[in-house]
């Protein structure tokens, strides 16, 4: 396939806001590509040349791309810079100035050159990147150049999510979504949709079934549902294991021989943050190849008191890591093992995985196994919960004893019970920032005064609004919000956002914030859950807690289904409170 033809599909996707139409366009595209192209096209749809967990970035600013355009299009740099200020989109500038009708490269040729650009480093690499990008711009159709430039700048933003791509892969083969579960299972244990698509194109469903857990490929993490009372846990699980819930940094640690990689909840490779943990893994899992999960949490070495998440995540800064290790030492509380010496343990029941974890771990200071109790008594669960709260922890997680580890799934195999605050929702909501409103009055100087936030509809692959928030952040945080959001602002509402509210500035759904609210109410202006009866759901008196939650991506946000469940729990609690007063 020529890159110009792929660009035409990108154009069609960009012009539609209908998910089914988008899926059908993708399915039509996939039917036309072969096994050497399918993985590359999947990566390019996400504006990348590798899966998300691989730290491969183009590293080219607007200025460098303008240099490449000037070189390729033979237009003076000053003229391009002036035009860019007027147009605001370097992709559209390529269309305006390119005279390359009739020229083109294949998708594979274009992808391979982009991959080379992303991997160039060292002395002379900047000029080499500019020259290679100029070659591509000069070799592609104007429309192809438009999308090429957007890919390099990280501004492709077609609004295509992984669920839509998985549906389209199935539809391309059998004209329905029937193969989606096989594709999704393979994706959940590899986190690499390009690889999964290539295997599917080469060997069909049987090849997908043969995909196994591999050390080095992060597994999409299992997630817990929520309830508001210990009695509900027993009602759903019966006899179960109960563990503390830490306010830490959830880690998935992969060790093969002497190599260790540490992935965050949103599958970022954060190994650099934890040199002390890497050392501990090598010591406490000697001669074992493992994938384990746990919660890393910083503590005060003098008092033993745990610090909140915001302290642990300070290690995300790529400088002074050794200083942070000394200042904020951390403990890893391991709670699961997903692979051990060649065996995929995800299909084993919880109780067997726990035994294998205990057998594999050598005792040491840095890594310990999360304590647990096994009970069918709600009073014992409540007592354990209160003990955890007294220790400054978030709450508890209950786990079904016979449940496998279900990668990428949120269900009632795991149930969390978190601290409830008087007059507040029993749990916070992880919201995605969708846009912002310019400040008025005192906040006019910041250029930002409120955020439009939403939650994720995982059935429709859309982000839906749930609140406009103007309280919580400090003045310094408002300034930081403006800086990071302006880097991802877009001209119009993104295709994967459903909203009746028009903020002053739309942004790509990327950043997650933790929101506390008093309750969930019905709303005619918000789109969360509105397809049920025409009324949406909204957060009453919402406020942002802290800054951006860096360990979570947009698809890790609270879902519409969770909001509906929280609303039902809230109504149930009110009925019970009222009956207590009678």
Swiss-Prot record:
Cofactors demanded by this protein: Mg(2+)
What's the protein here called? Probable DNA ligase
Q: Short name of one Pfam family for this protein?
A: DNA_ligase_A_N
So where's the catalytic machinery, residue-wise? Answer: 245 (n6-amp-lysine intermediate)
Q: Which family is annotated?
A: Belongs to the ATP-dependent DNA ligase family.
Q: What is the lineage of its organism?
A: Bacteria, Pseudomonadati, Dictyoglomota, Dictyoglomia, Dictyoglomales
State whether keyword Ribosomal protein applies.
no
Residues noted as binding ATP in the record, renumbered to the chain = 243, 250, 265, 295, 335, 410, 416
Q: Please give the PANTHER family that the UniProt record associates with this protein.
A: DNA LIGASE 1, DNA LIGASE 1/3 FAMILY MEMBER
Q: What GO molecular-function term can you cite, just one?
A: DNA binding
> What is the catalytic activity of this protein?
ATP + (deoxyribonucleotide)n-3'-hydroxyl + 5'-phospho-(deoxyribonucleotide)m = (deoxyribonucleotide)n+m + AMP + diphosphate
Q: Per its database record, what is this protein's job?
A: DNA ligase that seals nicks in double-stranded DNA during DNA replication, DNA recombination and DNA repair.
Q: What class of enzyme is it?
A: ligase
Q: EC annotation? A: 6.5.1.1
Q: Mind listing the UniProt keywords for this protein, alphabetically?
A: ATP-binding, Cell cycle, Cell division, DNA damage, DNA recombination, DNA repair, DNA replication, Ligase, Magnesium, Metal-binding, Nucleotide-binding
Would you kindly state one Gene Ontology biological process term found in this protein's UniProt entry? DNA repair
NCBIfam families hit by this protein: dnl1
Organism (species): Dictyoglomus thermophilum (strain ATCC 35947 / DSM 3960 / H-6-12)
């Amino acid at each position: 396939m020529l890159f110009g033809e792929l660009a035409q599909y990108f154009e069609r996707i960009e012009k539609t806001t209908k998910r089914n139409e988008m899926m059908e366009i993708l399915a039509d595209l996939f039917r036309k590509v072969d096994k050497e192209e399918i993985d590359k096209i999947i990566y390019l749809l996400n504006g990348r040349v590798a899966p998300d967990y691989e730290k491969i970035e183009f590293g080219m600013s607007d200025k460098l791309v303008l240099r490449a355009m000037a070189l390729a299009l033979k237009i003076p740099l000053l003229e391009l810079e002036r035009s860019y200020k007027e147009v605001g989109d370097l992709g559209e500038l390529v269309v305006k100035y390119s005279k390359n009708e009739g020229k083109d490269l294949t998708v594979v040729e274009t992808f391979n050159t982009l991959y080379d650009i992303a991997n160039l480093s060292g002395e002379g690499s900047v000029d080499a990147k500019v020259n290679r990008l100029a070659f591509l711009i000069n070799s592609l159709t104007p429309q192809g150049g438009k999308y090429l430039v957007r890919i390099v700048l990280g501004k492709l933003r077609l609004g295509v999510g992984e669920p839509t791509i998985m549906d389209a892969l199935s539809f391309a083969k059998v004209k329905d979504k029937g193969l989606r579960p096989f594709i999704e299972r393979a994706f959940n244990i590899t986190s690499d949709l390009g690889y999964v698509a290539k295997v599917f194109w080469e060997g069909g469903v049987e090849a997908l079934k043969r995909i196994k857990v591999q050390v080095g490929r992060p597994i999409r993490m299992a997630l817990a549902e929520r309830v508001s009372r210990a009695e509900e846990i027993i009602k759903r699980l019966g006899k179960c294991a109960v563990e503390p819930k830490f306010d830490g940094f959830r880690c998935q640690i992969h060790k093969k021989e002497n190599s260790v990689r540490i992935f965050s909840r949103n599958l970022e490779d954060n190994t650099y943050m934890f040199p002390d943990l890497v050392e501990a893994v090598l010591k406490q899992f000697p001669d074992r190849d493992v994938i384990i999960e746990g919660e890393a949490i910083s503590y005060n070495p003098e008092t033993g008191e745990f610090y909140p998440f915001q302290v642990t995540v300070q290690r995300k800064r790529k400088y002074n890591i050794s200083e942070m290790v000394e200042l904020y030492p951390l403990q890893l509380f391991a709670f699961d093992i997903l692979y051990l010496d060649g065996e995929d343990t995800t299909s084993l029941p919880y109780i067997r995985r726990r035994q294998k974890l205990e057998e594999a771990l050598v005792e040491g200071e840095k890594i310990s196994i999360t304590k647990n109790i096994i009970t069918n008594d709600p009073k014992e669960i409540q007592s354990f919960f209160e003990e955890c709260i007294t220790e400054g922890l978030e709450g508890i997680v209950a786990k079904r004893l016979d449940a496998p580890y279900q990668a990428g799934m949120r269900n009632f195999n795991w149930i969390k019970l978190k601290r409830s605050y008087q007059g507040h929702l029993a749990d916070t909501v992880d919201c995605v920032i969708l846009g912002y409103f310019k400040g008025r009055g005192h906040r006019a100087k910041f250029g930002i005064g409120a955020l439009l936030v939403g939650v994720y509809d995982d059935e429709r692959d859309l982000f839906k609004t749930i609140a406009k928030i103007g309280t919580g952040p400090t003045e310094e945080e408002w300034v930081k919000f403006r800086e990071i959001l302006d880097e991802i602002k877009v001209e119009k509402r993104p295709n994967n956002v459903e909203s009746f509210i028009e903020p002053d500035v739309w942004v790509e759904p990327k950043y997650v914030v933790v929101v506390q609210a008093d309750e969930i109410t019905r709303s005619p202006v918000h789109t969360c859950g509105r397809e049920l009866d025409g009324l949406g759901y909204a957060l009453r008196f919402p406020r942002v807690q802290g800054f951006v939650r860096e360990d979570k991506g947009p698809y890790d946000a609270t879902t519409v289904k969770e909001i509906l469940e929280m609303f039902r729990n809230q109504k149930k609690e009110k009925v019970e409170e009222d009956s207590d007063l009678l």
